[in-house]
Design a protein with these regions (language model features):
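Amphipathic alpha-helical polymerization modules
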Residues: 1-145
Length: 145
């Protein structure tokens, strides 16, 4: 893998973790949203990742020769199908006939834990990028001596 290939892999990781962080932020922001624009209760969203694929046959053959992957990409953002939390609040405008309001299936503690995980993964990718950049700079300096 070339130096630029290593930088590209790190960049894809940072982009993927940024999307994950954006999704987590959206979940936290909507923790008390009882209905969206369509009148439905907000559902927690999760980011799914997959390896970046090899677009050509020759690149696919390179995998058999020890070729390293091209990074990660977001395959999709899915809604969590689990039910929301029912809270008794008969004065709420979205309460049902029994006085219960359905709140989103978002757990703030879980989202904060996921946010820490996404931040650490992003930082790890930044560290790899900076290390790769440092190696490239040292290699250029060797040629100057």
């Amino acid at each position: 893998m070339s130096v630029f290939g290593a930088m590209d892999v790190s960049a894809t990781g940072m982009t993927a973790q940024q999307t994950r962080m954006d999704t987590i932020s959206q979940n936290i922001a909507n923790v008390n949203t009882t209905r969206d624009g369509n009148g439905n209760v907000y559902r927690r969203k999760t980011v799914l990742f997959e390896e970046k694929s090899y677009p050509t046959f020759s690149e696919t053959l390179g995998m058999a020769n020890g070729h390293i992957g091209k990074g990660v990409k977001v395959s999709q953002i899915v809604e969590d199908p689990s039910e929301g939390n029912m809270v008794y609040d008969p004065s709420h405008p979205d309460a049902n006939e029994d006085g219960y309001v359905t709140y989103p299936n978002v757990n703030t503690v879980t989202e904060m834990t996921n946010m820490i995980d996404a931040t650490r993964a992003f930082e790890a990718n930044v560290t790899v990028l900076n290390s790769t950049k440092g190696m490239a700079m040292r290699a250029l300096n060797i040629g100057q001596s």
